């Protein structure tokens, strides 16, 4: 394995560029042409991408994971070129000062601090206007894309209002019932959460179809659909992680490109929020395999947004995280190494393998089927640890045992199964990208997007 010290100079250079950006309030320049596009052209479209749980340790580990071992340098990821700063994430909660996804998303959608669990409402329970609603008021097309349920905390905080993120059925109702200028306020909805739309008390899928929306539930139908308004639900709950996904379930890149293609038909432009939801879920699970799988899914969607913006020349792209998750560390137990090869050996997530074993599959056969033995040759002790966990027949016990193998072999550390409160990176490209530079607060994401939309609003951010 190549040692990191041989390859750190380019990363240091990138970091120094980013640091100078923070100090000066400027954005790293890819070229004079891109600078012209970023600073002089009017904004027609805004794309906000949120890597849920994606702290700096995740973006750093992903860089090392994707590194080309044949070179002497650590190659940058798609994110690195457009790093402009970092943001604080704390909520305005009477009992907690580490944010959840709802409070953080509300900060980024509405520009206000609020309590954990709040969906675009303030501490008094009053609804706060979101940037998606502002875009719709300006006549733009709007969309939400996520790998979680589309009613989960982050997308919900852009497209609905509720005192609790747990009310996912009510959030689904809001997506249909709440109008802006007499129109449904979200034109494209792509993600999971079918169970929140197809219920005994209400069938929102039928209602959306009656209102003129297309409905799709697999990748093939989504890609061939020609309509500008579409509801796409590809799982009852969240989508499988990228590494576990079958061909009939779209990737985050697929959904992002589909949303952009449909929304871009609107002559007045569009607003789109895209969430890589399950970076966070993997972090909660202390699952490094799942985390890196979801980082790749998110990077590909991010690249799709950037590629569109470069061609369009009137699109602002902002990418960030709502918080970090798991207290993830690159290196653990006092060992000064971190190895990506064990992670690359996985063909499926520990969750996937654990469910197979809990259903009665042979432990050793399952592990060796879904873990490349050339990259990670399992020891007898490692196999026995999973066999011991399997005696309980509990998926969680088996999952933890398999995750422990990957964590130990890669020297990955975790401190919690919850969120952590550090600042998170901010990336931006296109017109007004410089407004996101430096040390900012997460509420400034929304405030700057409102400005980009030329929407005048007085935000009560007491």
From Swiss-Prot:
Q: May I ask which residue range the UniProt record assigns to the signal sequence?
A: 1-32
Question: Does the keyword Magnesium feature in the UniProt annotation?
Answer: yes
GO terms (molecular function) for this protein are: alkaline phosphatase activity; metal ion binding
Residues the record lists as binding Mg(2+): 52, 154, 275
Enzyme class of the recorded protein, top EC level: hydrolase
Alphabetical UniProt keywords: Hydrolase, Magnesium, Metal-binding, Phosphoprotein, Signal, Zinc
Question: What is the reaction catalyzed?
Answer: a phosphate monoester + H2O = an alcohol + phosphate
Can the keyword Cell cycle be found in this entry's annotation?
A: no
Give the cofactor note text.
Binds 1 Mg(2+) ion.
Q: Enumerate the active-site residues.
A: 101
What are the binding positions for Zn(2+) 1 in this chain?
Answer: 280, 284, 419
Binding residues annotated for Zn(2+) 2, in chain numbering: 52, 322-323
Pfam families the UniProt entry points to: Alk_phosphatase
Which coenzyme or cofactor does it need?
Answer: Mg(2+); Zn(2+)
Name of the protein this chain belongs to: Alkaline phosphatase 3
Q: What is the lineage of its organism?
A: Bacteria, Bacillati, Bacillota, Bacilli, Bacillales
- Name the gene that codes for it: phoB
């Amino acid at each position: 394995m190549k040692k990191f010290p041989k390859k750190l100079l380019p990363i240091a250079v990138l970091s120094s560029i980013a640091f100078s950006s923070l100090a000066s309030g400027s954005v790293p320049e890819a070229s004079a042409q891109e600078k012209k596009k970023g600073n002089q052209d009017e904004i027609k479209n805004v794309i906000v991408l949120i890597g849920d749980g994606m702290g700096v340790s995740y973006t750093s580990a992903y860089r090392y994971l994707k590194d080309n071992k044949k070179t002497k340098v650590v190659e940058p990821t798609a994110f690195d070129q457009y790093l402009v700063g970092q943001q604080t994430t704390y909520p305005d909660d009477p009992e907690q000062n580490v944010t959840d996804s709802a409070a953080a998303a509300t900060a980024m959608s509405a520009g206000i601090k609020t309590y954990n669990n709040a969906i675009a409402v303030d501490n008094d329970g009053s609804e706060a206007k979101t940037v998606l609603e502002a875009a719709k008021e300006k006549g733009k097309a709007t969309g939400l894309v996520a790998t979680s349920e589309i009613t989960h905390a982050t997308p919900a905080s852009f497209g609905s209002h509720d005192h609790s993120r747990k009310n996912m059925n009510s959030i689904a109702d809001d997506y249909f019932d709440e109008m802006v200028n007499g129109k449904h306020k979200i034109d494209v909805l792509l993600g999971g959460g079918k169970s929140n739309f197809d219920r005994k008390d209400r069938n929102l899928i039928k209602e959306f179809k009656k209102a003129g929306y297309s409905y799709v539930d697999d990748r093939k139908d989504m890609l061939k659909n020609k309509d500008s308004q579409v509801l796409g639900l590809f799982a009852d709950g969240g989508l499988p992680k990228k590494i576990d996904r079958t061909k009939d379930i779209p990737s985050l890149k697929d959904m992002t490109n589909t949303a952009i293609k449909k929304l871009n038909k609107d002559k007045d432009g569009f607003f789109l929020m895209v969430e890589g939801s399950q970076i966070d879920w993997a972090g909660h699970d202390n699952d490094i395999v799942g985390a890196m799988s979801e980082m790749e899914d998110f990077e590909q969607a991010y690249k799709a947004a950037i590629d569109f913006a470069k061609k369009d020349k009137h699109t602002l792209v902002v990418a960030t995280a709502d918080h970090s998750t798991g207290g993830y560390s690159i290196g653990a137990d006092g060992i000064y190494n971190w190895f990506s090869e064990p992670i690359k050996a996985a063909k499926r997530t520990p969750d996937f393998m654990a469910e197979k074993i809990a259903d009665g599959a042979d432990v050793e056969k399952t592990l060796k089927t879904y873990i490349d033995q050339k990259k990670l040759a399992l020891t007898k002790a490692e196999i026995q640890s999973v066999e011991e966990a399997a005696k309980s027949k509990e998926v969680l016990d088996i999952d933890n045992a398999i995750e422990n193998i990957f964590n130990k072999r890669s020297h990955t550390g975790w401190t919690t199964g919850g969120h952590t409160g550090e600042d998170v990176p901010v990336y931006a490209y296109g017109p007004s990208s410089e407004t996101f530079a430096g040390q900012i607060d997460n509420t400034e994401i929304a405030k700057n997007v409102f400005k980009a939309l030329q929407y005048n609003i007085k935000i009560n951010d007491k």
